[in-house]
């Protein structure tokens, strides 16, 4: 019998024996008399007067956290981050979806809000929210990621938890009207190539989007995860552009203009661009490339003992479906396939799992994803071969490591 086969059988027997021992301990504990808790001896609370359910008080630690990286003179932060370490499925609850604003959160009355479509169209159109609600709608599950996700951790460990390193990421069910339906109704000119989306916030945040993308899969969204948008998510109306950096999915949408060229707004020149090795800057790098991260165990956590631990995490790609995730427990020297949890959906978070038998020695764990185009998540060193990593650098999709000490403490290991 080959040595590899013999080794595999020995390992399998060890795993089975460990699992059996654990099962015996569970059965032994279950055989002890079960005390009746106080909660089973008296009535519980009545239905509260408030009409909106909230999590248990024992889950108050699960919350969005604002970033302290960029805080203005009024001590305001315009980012808050999703607690990925506490997310157990691919859908992020509405109250935990990350926030990113350019001029605060406006309070818009849907009864007076209007959407205008104009420019290179045969018939300019104006819609109220009631008008849009009369159209048929579609619902899709998609991730949304800020282009600045992980920007503080390129070559040194600046953040502690996965919420801080990767928390500008969420996933939801988005419901709305395809923009293509409304543009077809308006009648787009044959030589049109670009579309402007403008928000009604204090910054009038505006982006130029190629017409072919708009006609493909862009939505005008008003519900998110089955309820109307939260104010911080663009209530009453936002654009949603699947797979692309979050800032192009303009919130509080008020205007769509069709033209034959992009506008080169501040958010397309001074911001949301990538420095290149030749000193130039790359514009319109819209797509969020294939990426993954281990969320359990991750920074700030501690493994209580050696033995079996399930490594968990998320993978995603703006170009399509995640087709594979590999996990390394030795700093990237060797990789083993993880299990992808169904459903695996196009441009959506995919959850992966890997069963790790930790021997109690220091380790470095990381994940690496592959998408349906064959693109393999790069290392930071790979990215540095084609881009300049200096200053405020976005679009970080590099492999992200966590170190595990002999005592079980998990820390950011980017370097």
Can you annotate each of these PLM segments?
Residues 18-22:
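Hydrophobic h-region of N-terminal signal peptides that target proteins for export
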Residues 32-415:
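Structured, non-membrane catalytic/scaffold regions adjacent to prosthetic-group chemistry
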Residues 12-13, 17, 31, 245:
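Enrichment for repetitive, rod-forming helical segments
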